[in-house]
Amino acid sequence: DEAAKIIDQKKLSLPSSLDDLNTTIFPAYTTAAGWLGYSDEKMKRLVEENLSKGWTHFKMKVGQDIERDIHRCKLVRELIGNKNKLMVDSNQIWSVNETIENIGKLKQFDILFYEEPTNPDDVLGFKKIKDAHPDVNLATGEMIQNKVMFKQFIEHKSLDYCQIDSCRIASINEILPVLLIASKFNTPVIPHAVGVGLCEYVQHLNLINKFIISNHDLLLSEYAESCSEHFENPAIIRDGGYVTPTNPGYSVKIKDSSLNEFDYNN
């Protein structure tokens, strides 16, 4: 009943025409400039290139060495300015106590969210981090396989941003309950999309969540150009956001030429 009420209420504010829907640009962020191992010069070049393309949200990897992390965050923050957004992802590398300590050192860079700072199954560990730093945002979800784990994270207030993975979870039938749970608790959903075909999947989920489920003001999704040239209808990015797809289907049909080229028998 609650789910039906959420959807029925949201349907009242649907776009009045397909033209309104088709002109929607869904905001995205890029990790293209922030991978570990990049030199300062390469990071600077890539950040400047992405700024020129209209990107306003940047994510970078951290976790190898905190002093290097501080240096990299300072570099990127100075390049993007104070109006653009910066996020960090440590890919589960820190313990809970290390996370608490390191967040204290990175706060100065006005981080929008800290992604997967520790073990992605540790609901209570995330809660301990939140209790230590109630003023920061934690994000996780790309390793979560089902709606029950998301329910536990959200109900315990252990995360601030819900990062569903369209392939990790068992189909859209399991994803929709997660979107509805997040909506009930007013938790933003920012899908994970680093992986072949993930951007093509999530562009549809973003619009379903925006127009039919969520009432949250924050709209954002990850983008990574992962082998998009092999898809018949790849996700299109303009001015730092997803252009609404207009072709039918889930956009993940691989080109016959690519299948033939990379087929095991060939």
Question: What are the functions of these language-model segments?
Answer:
Residues 38-41, 64-80, 95-99, 118-131, ...:
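Active-site-adjacent beta->alpha loops and helix N-cap segments on the catalytic face
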Residues 1-86, 91-100, 104-108, 231-266:
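N-terminal capping/lid subdomain adjacent to the active-site entrance of alpha/beta enzymes
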Residues 27-33, 56-60, 84-90, 114-115, ...:
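Hydrophobic faces of well-ordered beta-strands that scaffold small-molecule active sites
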Residues 104, 110, 121-248:
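Shared catalytic-loop signature of beta/alpha-barrel
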